[in-house]
Amino acid sequence: NPDNSLAHRTTWLRSDFSKPDGTDWSVAVQDPEGEEGSYMGVINLSGTACVSTSGDYEKYFIQDGKRYHHILDPSTGYPSESGLSSVTIICPDEGEWKQDAGLLSDGLSTACFVLGAEKGMELLEEYGMEGVFIDKKKQVSVTECIADRFTLLHSEYTIN
């Protein structure tokens, strides 16, 4: 596990991302292809924010050799086939979103998962939010404002 990190194991996490000594916290991003507790990257965050992740790797079942996850595409009624494995959203817990940052980050992580990386990044830009998108080919897309705060930990992944 990364030193001085918050392991993001819940649907969403709210925290003041400054430690008592004033340094940033590191939020670990789960490796969707790895064992539970293995991380593919970390995001260093300061300030107060809510962080949410939607992924296809924890809640699923296999029937007739096909894997079905829990994130449904409302246009088909079936599990999303956006090509993504995981989407992590960072929503500042301040300004106009202060009261609803947790709900917004959770909703946006699911919406962006269904939309796919390109449309999901566009949606985040409209809302002024940040995110990390991981696709099935282990390609990672990171929004511009947190690109310098994201560290890739796993050599099998590449950043777009």
Descriptions of predicted regions:
Residues N1-N160:
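Mature catalytic core of soluble alpha/beta enzymes
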